Curated annotation (Swiss-Prot):
Name of the gene encoding the protein in the UniProt record: TPS19
Protein name per Swiss-Prot or TrEMBL: Terpenoid synthase 19
PANTHER family in UniProt: ALPHA-HUMULENE_(-)-(E)-BETA-CARYOPHYLLENE SYNTHASE, OS04G0344100 PROTEIN-RELATED
Location relative to the cell: Cytoplasm
Chief place of localization: cytoplasm
Record flagged with keyword Cytoplasm: yes
Family matches, as SUPFAM superfamilies: Terpenoid cyclases/Protein prenyltransferases, Terpenoid synthases
Catalytic activity, EC: 4.2.3.-
Any one GO molecular-function label of the UniProt entry: magnesium ion binding
GO BP, sorted A to Z: diterpenoid biosynthetic process
Any Pfam family matching the protein: Terpene_synth
EC category: lyase
Amino acid sequence: MEATRMGFGGLSVPLSLTPNLSLIPQRLLDKHNLSLKPVKIHHLVCVRSTKSSDDLETSRPSTYFSPSLWGDHFLSVSLDHAEFVELEREIETMKPLVKDMLMSSQSSDKEKIRLIHLLVSLGSSYHFDKEIQDILKHSFTKLDGIIVEEDDLETISIMFEVFRLYGHKMSCDAFDRFRGGDGRFKESLAKDVRGMLQLFEVAHLGTLSEDIMDEALRFTRNHLESLTSGNVSSASPHILKHIQNSLYIPRYCNIEVLVAREYISYYEQEEGYNEILLKFAKLNFNFCQCHYIQEIKTLTKWWKDLDLASKLPYIRDRSVESHLGGLGPYFEPQYSLGRIIVAKTIMIIVVADDTYDAHATIPEATVLTEYFQRLNIGADDKLSGYLRIVLESVFEVMGEIEQEMSPKGRSYSVKQVLERFKIIAKAYKQLTEWARKGHVPTFDEYMKVGLVTAGMGDYAGYCFIGMEDINEKEAFEWLNSNPLLIDALNVLFRIANDVGTYETEINRGEVANGLNCYMKQYGVTKEEASRELRKMYIYNKKVVVEEFMNSHDRVPRQVLLRCLNFARLFDVIYTEGDGYSEPKGKIEHFMTSLYVHPIPLS
């Protein structure tokens, strides 16, 4: 089970060039020195075909995915426009009350930061983003004085989280006061359940050089697990449930809106909760949910009109799951159009991906790739059959998005996304060749291609299209500068995806899987390979946090926050296997809580 449950919850380059592997795999592989281990083959899956080379060239896999969980369900869900209006009216009525709390001159810096943390937890902070940034900018200049005599673990941990989330790198030295003479965290801290939980959460915001955060994570996890597994506990039931949820998916391994949905339920059971803040959070969530339902209705109708699920029965029919792919980066109502664009783009790219993975022969994959390089089918071309359907669908959908965004002056982003797709198509073709021939490349060879198909630079580009609050050309200039943040995200996605899909990919003959390739190159078992990939995952999670922190002086926070949220989404999707392809179970539960059940206001 370790291989399929690891707790996960680039900039595309021509294949003729070597992607930036300074982070992984080479540096990590050198560090772990696995190549010096005696080579011993354990359970390596390698297809030995008796077919001729010509047969392999034209072989077609017989892969079909499970049908959609949702079908046309959301088309029958009624949305009352009057409810939309009333929710928005109530939110606007309450905003000044919450703002007054935030800006109160009677509140200390620590009290304001704790309130900011509560607003973030409840999913309401975006309403006051400018005010929050101003407060934190001012408070950070006098941080030493604020914390000099603070000995409350929860308070220090909250301040650490809030400052880091908003781009202020509060030093982890602040936690030295909670360590004993032996350098370890004091065992007496275990009695402070709230402080321990908060330290556990912020330990996920450590960077590469901050070993104390690794120690904090081990220390808090051990004690919190003991607390929840014991028969007797002094903690309240709602706190124990909150701890169990956090141990399963920590806050920064979960998407913002799911954190808010769970935290609202928890906060309502807290003694002395603030009624105004709770009601504001509930109204806000239900208002967001109305937006999500309307967006999914739009996507469902659009997808149904395309009729690709029946024309191309081998593809994944995942409109609601694709919306989750847009919701992860940004959940706020103002990004409604952005979520629709991201979801449409994901769905149409999945059509291409599934064609390469699950249906095309090698010659067909070659033809497909050639047309993607041209970004045009051409009137004189005699392309027929399903390949024409795939190509026309991709080009037409991206053309529709460009046409929609052009009046807003944002067609540049769409052109950039298409240019980047030329490169990812070449990588898809390489994976197709390996799969059809049953070839298991070395891990190093595989990652040169796999980091391209991870496509995090492309994913960021999808998000930029609908972000009207950023300068799209500047955002793509940063994206095209080979940022380390995107490199690390590519590694995270590739590892999470390959581990989460290992069993299903191997069962359908796709032996060029990162886990399988690692087993081959280093002669280790699946369990050993899983552990090493997990180390790479943790390492690159820290890189993401570090680059998020270090880039605020030159990259807009709205851009960086999307990237941080990508990593959180991977942890959700791949918590138990591949939640996108097989959403039945945990992902279905998450989607139901977000899209089906509103929060009762009383």
